[in-house]
Each structure stands twice: as structure tokens, then as C-alpha cells.
Amino acid sequence: MAKEKFERTKPHVNVGTIGHVDHGKTTLTAAITTILSKKFGGEAKDYSQIDSAPEEKARGITINTAHVEYETETRHYAHVDCPGHADYVKNMITGAAQMDGAILVCSAADGPMPQTREHILLSRQVGVPYIIVYLNKADLVDDAELLELVEMEVRDLLSSYDFPGDDTPIVTGSARLALEGDQSEMGEPSIFRLADALDSYIPTPERAIDKPFLLPIEDVFSISGRGTVVTGRVERGIVKVGEELEIVGLKDTVKTTCTGVEMFRKLLDQGQAGDNVGVLLRGTKREDVERGQVLAKPGTITPHTKFEASVYVLSKDEGGRHTPFFANYRPQFYFRTTDVTGAISLAEGVEMVMPGDNVEIKVELIAPIAMEEGLRFAIREGGRTVGAGVVAKIIA
């Protein structure tokens, strides 16, 4: 029989499991794939397959992540699970796995623990928009009042980080029982309840192509008789011939007009998210544009120099610094396609930052970058990556 073509008829949503070590994230991931594959097709993955997560690199940082896929009645999900706490921090900060929603796994027997809190905070800082809770190991709790207490604790914790704790779906169950095929409420049915919560609570994400046009400029050429061409990969949206655009970052924002789009030496009438294109600009001089700026739909992105960020500083073993850094440390910040020097200030009471730390910092760049909350960057010293970060809040 011919290999079936991958039919992308259902909308695609990216999710992942978060939560404290040993609360059952990987067991739950195995249970979801196993149980949903029986009903909707797809591939079941067992615990050991997920736990032996392969290494991958994102922004010069090595991360262990397991990727699984599953289907529900209405959607196709791509799901990430990380073996260690440090992998979660790195994954979420580098944006290696952008999540449209997260499944917070919390053991009903233990209640919220330090990493439960840390992962919720991280989700808030890196812009994970929705969290659903799976209260795991509920089969080990005999007292219904105790379950209610843990549920209240989790809701309060979510609310304290500006998630809607009172409205968050909480599914109570046992991933282990579900994996063993148990048909009680705690077993397989809890996985179907979780799938329903995912389907109904996380809205279908806006596709990259439907967002406002943005292209990080990688190179600039001058074509005699035609004008200036900028090249790069369209990050989001669509650009059409004849549209007015803005060039943002590094200098004052200027307006320009797209007079042509080229891909593989062919002229097109438009370029869209994912395309590597050359965009011909009218009335723009070659020397007015440079790598590191962005070409964008007018009014959709602005240049900034000051921001708050959540960063992960590479450990010595990961090829990072061997020594701590202090306030006023001035590395380069690599945004999209270029490095910009900036000065770091630390939170009050924080004397220094050690390699391997995950901290909140404030940054002031020497030149403005087209920026929005959620933008990822690398921290570099002389071309070597020493950290990764995400813009949590723009100051100026």
C-alpha cells in the first residue's frame, strides 16, 4: 500500500508539559500518546522513548527535548517534554519550543513545589498564553478534601502570576493508571477529559501568515536601474508588490514601498511567512538600510533600547562564562540578524550572576532594535554565546 500523505486538515497547536520533577510529566506524556492514538490514530510512545530525549541546539545552546504528536477530535498537537529542570528553562527562554499552551502537571499527593512555581513564572515571562492543570497521582490521595485543598493551592498560585486561576481547567487523574489501561475515572477517562480541556480552552493560534508582515533584513544590494533590494526570510505575514512598508531599528524609522518580490530569481507578486525573498524597495538608498533592521507593515513594530528580560546564563560546561558577571556588564545582544552592545543592570539585592543562573535583568542598548514582548535574543561575547533571553517588558 502506498504511504499515506500527511493530511493537515486539522488545525495545529503546540503544547508542552511543565511542572516539578517527579510529578509525572513524562508519564502523562506517554499516557496521552498511548490513549489518544488508540482512538484517533497516531503513534503511541512509551516512557523510555520520551525520557531518552535527544539533544538539539537552539541559539547556540544544547537542550534535551522530547517531541511527540497526537490527535484529538478537532486538532493535531505537537507536544514537548523535557527531562530536566534546566532543559525547561533553556527551552522556554530560547523559544526552541514555542507553546500555545502548557499542561501543568502537579502531584495531588505533594501539592505545588518550587519548580511548579518556577515553571508558572517562566510561562508568564516568556508569554505562554494558556495553562491547563493535570492533578496527577490522585489515586494516592484518599481524602477528597485534601484534593480540593491542593486544587485551591494551584489556582491561587496561578492567579498570583496573573493567570486566571479561578477559570483554569483542572483535570484530576492518574497518568500511571491511565497508562495501565485503567477504566475508572482516574484512569483513561481522565486523559480524554484533558484532551477536551486542551481543545476547548486553548484557542486555535493565529497562523504566522495571518500576522502583520515582518522580515528581518539579512543583506542589502543595489541593482543598477532597479534600486535597492533587501533579502531575508519572511518571519510572518505577507508582502505584496505596491505596499507601503517601514524600515525599523538601528536608525530613525523610514517609510518605503515594495516594488518587487523575488524568490529563486523569479519575480512574484507576493512573499509570505517562511519564504526566503528579495524585496525591491522604491526610493530607498543602499546606504540607508543595513542588516539588523526589519522590514515591516507600517505601525506594527517600534524600535526600543530599554527593556526587562528573563535570561538563562550558560554554565561553564555548556561553553559559557567561567566567572560571574556584575551590574554594568556590557556584552552583545544578538537580535534576529545582528549584535548590539548593551549594559545590564541587576535587580535590587542581586550582587552578581553565576554561570547556570536564570535571572531577571534590565538592559539598555546603544542602538534601538525593532522589538516586542516575547522577542528572543542571544547574549554573546566576541561571537560566543554566553546566554539566552526573552524580552519580558519594554521600558523605553
Swiss-Prot record:
PANTHER family in UniProt: ELONGATION FACTOR TU, MITOCHONDRIAL, ELONGATION FACTOR TU-RELATED
EC nos: 3.6.5.3
Pfam families for the chain: GTP_EFTU, GTP_EFTU_D2, GTP_EFTU_D3
Family membership: Belongs to the TRAFAC class translation factor GTPase superfamily. Classic translation factor GTPase family. EF-Tu/EF-1A subfamily.
Region (G2): 60-64
Residues holding Mg(2+): T26
SUPFAM superfamilies for the chain: EF-Tu/eEF-1alpha/eIF2-gamma C-terminal domain, P-loop containing nucleoside triphosphate hydrolases, Translation proteins
GO cellular component terms listed in the entry, alphabetical order: cytosol
Keywords of this entry: Cytoplasm, Elongation factor, GTP-binding, Hydrolase, Magnesium, Metal-binding, Nucleotide-binding, Protein biosynthesis
Domain tr-type G: 10-206
Region (G4): 136-139
Annotated localization: Cytoplasm
Segments for region (G1): 19-26
Complexes and interactors: Monomer.
Record GO terms (molecular function): GTP binding; GTPase activity; guanosine tetraphosphate binding; translation elongation factor activity
Chain residue ranges for the region called G3: 81-84
Protein name according to UniProt: Elongation factor Tu
UniProt: GTP binding residues: 19-26, 81-85, 136-139
Catalytic activity: GTP + H2O = GDP + phosphate + H(+)
Organism: Chromobacterium violaceum (strain ATCC 12472 / DSM 30191 / JCM 1249 / CCUG 213 / NBRC 12614 / NCIMB 9131 / NCTC 9757 / MK)
Chief subcellular location: cytoplasm
Region (G5), start-end ranges: 174-176
